[in-house]
């Protein structure tokens, strides 16, 4: 399956998602017992980005050489994501930093109160000053993974696999 080279806010995949999503959920139900599947929760207030990330990650499951496969849930509303969050269900959060109502750090602080073991990767289109961020948010919230948007598909997958290993 062909993957986009980069993830941009282009919105061209919305129609494709419904069909792909149903097929991918069926495939995952069959393979769920396999330990190489990891559950990813994406929260990004840009619907096109959230959908594109989901498509890219789940499409990468078709690569037989990839040792970790992804089961992805995406939200565009951090409050809804928090409300629906299931402790001990997700392996990794992929969260946009800048969102209205609740930023990515605030969301992760609340989620980590529910599930201390979930790993976190932050995304942003802005500059990343990790030292300043760690001073503002000194809790375990700040994981080792910061992803700058737009991101190359292969780089995104590599970073997520590294966090999950």
Residue ranges and their predicted role:
Residues 99:
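Receiver (REC) domain active-site loop signature in two-component systems and cognate sites
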Residues 83, 105-116:
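Short amphipathic alpha-helix used as the core "switch/output" element in two-component signaling
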Residues 47-73:
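Two-component/phosphorelay signaling modules centered on CheY-like receiver
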Residues 123-125:
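Hydrophobic/aromatic residues positioned on beta-strands within the core alpha/beta folds
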Residues 106, 127-148, 154-158:
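Alpha4 helix (beta4-alpha4-beta5 surface) of REC/receiver domains from two-component response regulators
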Residues 44, 96:
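Active-site residues of response regulator receiver
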Residues 73-92:
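Acidic, metal-coordinating helix/loop segments flanking the phosphotransfer/catalytic sites
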Residues 76-77, 103-107:
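Acidic catalytic/metal-coordinating carboxylates
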């Amino acid at each position: 399956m062909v993957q986009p080279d980069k993830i941009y806010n282009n919105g061209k995949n919305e129609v494709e998602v419904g069909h792909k999503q149903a097929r991918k959920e069926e495939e995952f139900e069959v393979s769920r017992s396999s330990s190489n599947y990891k559950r990813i929760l994406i929260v990004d207030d840009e619907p096109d980005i959230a959908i594109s990330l989901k498509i890219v990650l789940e499409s990468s499951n078709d690569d037989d050489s990839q040792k970790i496969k992804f089961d992805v849930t995406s939200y565009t509303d951090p409050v809804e994501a928090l409300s629906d969050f299931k402790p001990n269900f997700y392996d990794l959060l992929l969260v946009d930093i800048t969102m209205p109502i609740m930023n990515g750090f605030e969301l992760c602080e609340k989620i980590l109160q529910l599930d201390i073991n979930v790993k976190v990767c932050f995304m942003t289109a802005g500059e990343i000053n990790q030292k300043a961020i760690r001073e503002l948010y000194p809790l375990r919230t700040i994981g080792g993974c910061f992803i700058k948007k737009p991101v190359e598909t292969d780089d995104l997958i590599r970073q997520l696999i590294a966090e999950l290993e």
